[in-house]
Amino acid sequence: MTSALQKNRPGAAFPFDNSYVGLPPHFFAAQAPTAVAEPWLIKLNEALAAELGLDVEALRRDGAAIFSGNLVPEGAEPLAMAYAGHQFGGFSPQLGDGRAILLGEVVDRSGKRYDIQLKGAGPTPFSRRGDGRAAIGPVLREYIISEAMFALGIPATRALAAVTTGEPVYREEVLPGAVFTRVAASHIRVGTFQYFAARGDTDGVRALADYVIDRHYPALKEAENPYLALFDAVCERQAALIARWLHVGFIHGVMNTDNMTVSGETIDFGPCAFMDAYDPATVFSSIDQHGRYAYANQPGIGQWNLARLGETLLPLIDAEPDSAVDKANAVIKSYGERFQAHWLAGMLEKIGLAGEEDGDLDLVQALLSLMQAQGADFTLTFRRLSDLAGDDAAEPEFAASFREPDACGAWLTQWRERLSRDPQTASERAIAMRSVNPAFIPRNHRVEQAIEAAVDNGDFSLFEALLSVLSKPYEDQPGFAAYREPPKPSERVLATFCGT
């Protein structure tokens, strides 16, 4: 049992090169993790550790202590970041890392800088009477979803490790405690900018913007108006990101401004879920009672959040307020067109088209309307269409996606007519479609089954199996065909919950 913090024992397990700690002291609060009773390493992402240039052998040896927060690695400068945020439309001027502690930063072999953060590592000055801890269920969920998003090719924070703490956490029930180690390009959020803007701290906004440009958008240093260019670049990355969410049926669930990164990575997977049957109004998050963050609302919420970012940057964009507003408005108004372009390009890939013609949007919308009316599973329908693109014999299986199999006949006729003008061969098309239409997603019921086995029985075999399947989402994996299937009525997950 490790009962107290130890420092500097593991040597160079983490080659830290910290920069955020060099910002003004009111950007964060120095905060060491709180030791736990009996940490046990559930999972170490050895491939990611190697990519980051970490000492994998040292992490195998000391990982339970390091990733629980009991053993602070040499070079770490642990801190909790300050930020604010709009939560379901209401502004909170002070949120901050209430259960997360940034150990420091590392630079990988390609020169990219990443944060190493512990979630559930104990209370911080931003905990707001919380215990700063996390339960094992949300930790496993975040591990599964973040690694699945990576495998799907969607920018997202990564999972480096998960540990149990040997201590209970007290929620609606008593649950086993755990700590999650997250890797991110950075943890700077729209809400980080809002924190300083809400205090009238223009110097703080400027220091943060300069840091973000230097870290994430260095080419913008040469722009005529670097701060306007920064706003434009963040809008572009978010438009592309949210389009990718929609392409795989992902519903974030809690798109508050403190959960939107300026790096363009998906972050915070608490109540997120993947859609089964296609319905644009789908909501899973238990706290989203009015559907603010429903599947189809996500692009508009993204624009709303980015407008809040633009507001914080106005004093930097132009000293003349009206001119600053006009310039920022021009950027935010372009978001809709950008999103639509990214979304349509991806949807055309999903139905096998290499180029765009007039009428293609109508073809996509017709399929989505048919899927909604017929209760078709989002992921399976597009995967089966990929199979049909390469083999007409797969038509009965595609038709079986719909409650009334004959209902898809008219759409298939239109689709095939359109394919006749597409330059790809059938084989090329099928290969391309299978590379964008996954066979496997983190089905909500599969995630819950893995969590329940771990929580109730200490059995992590389903967790490991699910991680393995989801690491190759675009491969058929015949031995795991059951993981492709949507839930039976008795298996449906109706609501997801915040946790980490």
Swiss-Prot record:
Entry keywords, A to Z = ATP-binding, Magnesium, Manganese, Metal-binding, Nucleotide-binding, Nucleotidyltransferase, Transferase
The question of whether Manganese is a record keyword is answered with: yes
Which reactions appear under catalytic activity for this entry? L-seryl-[protein] + ATP = 3-O-(5'-adenylyl)-L-seryl-[protein] + diphosphate; L-threonyl-[protein] + ATP = 3-O-(5'-adenylyl)-L-threonyl-[protein] + diphosphate; L-tyrosyl-[protein] + ATP = O-(5'-adenylyl)-L-tyrosyl-[protein] + diphosphate; L-histidyl-[protein] + UTP = N(tele)-(5'-uridylyl)-L-histidyl-[protein] + diphosphate
Residues recorded as binding Mg(2+), renumbered to this chain, are 259, 268
Do you know which SUPFAM superfamilies this protein is assigned to?
Protein kinase-like (PK-like) (SSF56112)
Q: What is its EC number?
A: 2.7.7.-, 2.7.7.108
The cofactor(s) it depends on are: Mg(2+); Mn(2+)
Q: Where does ATP bind?
A: 96, 98-99, 119, 131-132, 182, 189, 268
- What InterPro entries has UniProt attached to this entry? Kinase-like_dom_sf, SelO
Specify whether Nucleotidyltransferase is a keyword of the entry.
yes
**Under the GO molecular function aspect, what terms does this record hold?**
AMPylase activity; ATP binding; magnesium ion binding
First-tier enzyme category under EC = transferase
What positions constitute the catalytic site? 258
NCBIfam families reported in the protein's UniProt record: PRK00029.1
User: Briefly, what is this protein's role?
Assistant: Nucleotidyltransferase involved in the post-translational modification of proteins. It can catalyze the addition of adenosine monophosphate (AMP) or uridine monophosphate (UMP) to a protein, resulting in modifications known as AMPylation and UMPylation.
Q: Which family is this sequence assigned to?
A: Belongs to the SELO family.
Name of the protein this chain belongs to: Protein nucleotidyltransferase YdiU
User: Could you tell me which species this protein originates from?
Assistant: Rhizobium johnstonii (strain DSM 114642 / LMG 32736 / 3841)
Species classification? Bacteria, Pseudomonadati, Pseudomonadota, Alphaproteobacteria, Hyphomicrobiales
Q: Which gene encodes it?
A: ydiU
